């Protein structure tokens, strides 16, 4: 049987992979957004695991709120990204931090 520690270890591995994705690839905005979403999903998995093993449904309800915020964040981030690509013809972070003046 899968115990709580298995879920927590898997969540920690996913969270660590997302942190590594953020630190190792700072050039591409799409990879940064995907790493942030992976981080949120790792936290959600821990919430669901704690909720399941404690018998309380509050953690699972909280996950729905986090998923809603994550979906809105992804939609706004991709909209900003498409506007930046239309204006600057690039999605590299180092090229986007320069201001026109």
UniProtKB/Swiss-Prot annotation:
It is an enzyme of class 7 (translocase). GO terms for cellular component: NADH dehydrogenase complex; plasma membrane. It is a multi-pass membrane protein. It catalyses: a quinone + NADH + 5 H(+)(in) = a quinol + NAD(+) + 4 H(+)(out). GO terms for molecular function: NADH:ubiquinone reductase (non-electrogenic) activity; quinone binding. Its EC number is 7.1.1.-. The chain crosses the membrane at residues 4-24, 30-50, 61-81. GO terms for biological process: ATP synthesis coupled electron transport. It holds the Pfam family Oxidored_q2. Keywords: Cell inner membrane, Cell membrane, Membrane, NAD, Quinone, Translocase, Transmembrane, Transmembrane helix, Transport, Ubiquinone. It is found in: Cell inner membrane. NDH-1 shuttles electrons from NADH, via FMN and iron-sulfur (Fe-S) centers, to quinones in the respiratory chain. The immediate electron acceptor for the enzyme in this species is believed to be ubiquinone. Couples the redox reaction to proton translocation (for every two electrons transferred, four hydrogen ions are translocated across the cytoplasmic membrane), and thus conserves the redox energy in a proton gradient. Belongs to the complex I subunit 4L family. NDH-1 is composed of 14 different subunits. Subunits NuoA, H, J, K, L, M, N constitute the membrane sector of the complex. This is NADH-quinone oxidoreductase subunit K. It comes from Thioalkalivibrio sulfidiphilus (strain HL-EbGR7). The lineage of its organism: Bacteria, Pseudomonadati, Pseudomonadota, Gammaproteobacteria, Chromatiales. The gene is nuoK.
């Amino acid at each position: 049987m899968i115990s709580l520690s298995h879920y927590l270890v898997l969540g920690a591995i996913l969270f660590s992979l997302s942190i590594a994705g953020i630190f190792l690839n700072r050039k591409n905005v799409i990879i940064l957004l995907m790493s942030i979403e992976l981080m949120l999903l790792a936290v959600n998995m821990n919430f669901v695991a704690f909720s399941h093993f404690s018998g309380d449904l509050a953690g699972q309800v909280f996950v729905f709120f986090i998923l809603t915020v994550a979906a809105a964040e992804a939609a706004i981030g991709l909209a900003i990204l498409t506007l930046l690509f239309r204006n600057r013809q690039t999605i590299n972070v180092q090229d986007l931090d320069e201001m026109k003046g």
